[in-house]
Amino acid sequence: MNEIILLKLGELVLKGLNRRTFEDRLVANARRRLQAHGKFKVYTKQSTMYVEPQSEDCDLDGAWEAMTKLFGVVGLSRARACAKDKDAMLQTAVEYLGDRLAAAKTFKVESKRADKSFPMTSIQLSQYVGGELDEKYPNLTVDVHHPELTVYLEVRDYAAYVHADPEPGAGGLPVGVGGRAVSLLSGGIDSPVASWMIAKRGIALEMVHFFSYPYTSEEAKQKVLTLAKLLTPWCGRLTVHVVPFTAIQEELRRKCPEELFTVLMRRFMMRIAEAVAQRCGAGAIVTGECLGQVASQTMEAMRATTAVTTLPILRPVVGMDKEEIVRIARKINTFETSILPYEDCCTAVSYTHLTLPTICSV
């Protein structure tokens, strides 16, 4: 039988009566990600999602890469389906995992019977297949605690599946089950990470970027669009709302005290973000603010900017160290783009900030 991808569902299996809604969203998200890689059959059964190629020209490697970035999945494996027979599973293990079995020094076999009508217990099946493999491959020694290779046998309703060590999935919840938010994407390290973290909790995103030409360059805008593209494999399709911001900044420079410039600018950003949110049906605003990281990100400054909107402000990186944020940025492949030397509107036009602004002062 053909090679397929098995995906283990995450916390969505605990959603009770809402579980079907979560699973349907996950399947829809998977199908959209797979469109570029060929025709696949995608369905869920028994806490597992199956991705089955429907033609020889399907790009299974590309499909695998896409599924590693699918929120809602905690583990995934490339597997070979076979008949629900102990000898068929043994033969499939030899054919499908033979090279890895020949290269390993220690191994074990783990079996799972979702189909309880199968005539052997899970332990009996593991002992049978493990014993036969141990005899066939003299290089192998059984190690049930710390094996170099684990062979998994899954007996399900319509077929059995053989695979080796699964890889971790993206975790989280399917994008879209938690509603919609607008995320302020500046071009720095923090805002893409904040967007990724919120998408991981099932929130669909629309991005807002404030563009201050000629103080910021076309390259700076392109950098932000590139960051959005890098987030797309995780977050799904993203719309970037590019907001001309030069006139507001110039007016603030003329009329407001220098020490209040940054906090007033951010209050305008929140008002505009709220207007965008209302137009696209979003229920929250996401920022990459990190408490104490810069002078404009104190608790008092955050309170002053939050006061102008009735929407909740989600700050997923607010309590993280910079090293933690950078580690995630490297993982999601946004770091190298974020550090390109193009200024955003906050750094290109700025003054010394008041670190403890009050609501009355602004």
Language-model regions, residue ranges each:
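Single conserved hydrophobic/aromatic residue that forms the stacking wall/gate
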Residues: 353-362
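Generic beta-strand/beta-sheet core signal
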Residues: 10, 163-165, 208-210, 243-246, ...
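RNA-binding accessory domains that recognize and position tRNA/RNA substrates
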Residues: 1-182, 192-238
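A short alpha-helix-loop-beta-strand transition element characteristic
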Residues: 333-341
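Active-site adenylate/phosphate-handling loop in enzymes that bind or generate adenylated species
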Residues: 128-133, 139, 166-178, 245, ...
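Small/polar glycine-rich anion-binding or flexible loop at a beta-alpha turn
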Residues: 293, 341-349
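A conserved beta-strand->alpha-helix junction
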Residues: 228-254, 344
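Conserved G/P- and acidic residue-centered "switch" motifs that form tight phosphate/ATP-binding loops
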Residues: 188
